[in-house]
Amino acid sequence: MPANGNPIIAFMSDLGTTDDSVAQCKGLMLSICPGVTIVDVNHSMTPWDVEEGARYIVDLPRFFPEGTVFATTTYPATGTATRSVALRIKQAAQGGARGQWAGSGAGFERAEGSYIYIAPNNGLLTTVIEEHGYIEAYEVSNTKVIPAEPEPTFYSREMVAIPSAHLAAGFPLNEVGRALSDDEIVRFAKPKPSTVSGGVLSGVITNIDHPFGNLWTNIHRTDLEKAGIGYQTQLRLLLDGVLTFDLPLVPTFADAGQIGDPVIYINSRGYLALARNAAPLAYPYNLKAGLTVTVTKA
């Protein structure tokens, strides 16, 4: 529970908002933990896409009070023996969100603190664990926090939403079920990391930033620094070995000039990205995640 005593659940799912599924989950959260603040992270992620969901939840501790419970779910294996996992992570203290990349804007201060994630044990927490590590992890099996006979087609409600509310209300994390060893926590295979060699940066498109159609890569700002690249450096970006963009690295979209002009920038998560000014890039060209990216100084 946050230090101010007001419980918070940040809720992400693939349930959509065209029926009452999310409302059922939130109603139960409120019934179990009256007064809880529920923040909707995203309910429109691609159904069953564990890797996409992982990207939406990894940065959340930077922006939430200590003690927040992150209820995160896409449950392709609903109704099977796949259980949920609840773990505590420790967010390190940090200053401004993007260091030198924050320009002249003031950063923010975040004291270190612990947070709880609950998710299906299907790899959804892969990136969270990689980024933050964890202090303790448990299988969610105690019938004090989940139904004795959970609805098999709705584990997102039964095995994530309901126990998240019990945790937000103060139920001890170490009593939700047995402790899990590290090798029992499922991870998905991560793509090969970006590389820097001889001034050439190589990476991939990790995802499309919907609904804007921007292309995000796995080339981090630290990779750019290693290659001596900063804002206004003229770059040549080769996409999938076919499309070439000769552009400077700039802070934001409007620096591209005209509406529709392409732009290379650092996204809010600290990674190199490619877009068009106030227009989609991915959709007109049918560009997808997984395409290769090569960057050099022009």
From Swiss-Prot:
Disulfide bonds: none annotated. Its EC number is 2.5.1.63. It comes from the Bacteria. One of its GO terms (molecular function) is adenosyl-fluoride synthase activity. The keyword Nucleotide-binding does not apply. InterPro entries: Fluorinase, SAM_HAT_C, SAM_HAT_N, SAM_OH_AdoTrfase, SAM_OH_AdoTrfase_C_sf, SAM_OH_AdoTrfase_N_sf. It holds the Pfam family SAM_HAT_N. Keywords: S-adenosyl-L-methionine, Transferase. The keyword S-adenosyl-L-methionine applies. It catalyses: fluoride + S-adenosyl-L-methionine = 5'-deoxy-5'-fluoroadenosine + L-methionine. S-adenosyl-L-methionine binds at D14, D19, D20, S21, Y75, S156, D209, N214, S268, R269, R276, N277, A278. NCBIfam families: fluorinase (TIGR04507). Belongs to the SAM hydrolase / SAM-dependent halogenase family. Catalyzes the formation of a C-F bond by combining S-adenosyl-L-methionine (SAM) and fluoride to generate 5'-fluoro-5'-deoxyadenosine (5'-FDA) and L-methionine. This is Fluorinase. It comes from Actinoplanes sp. (strain N902-109).
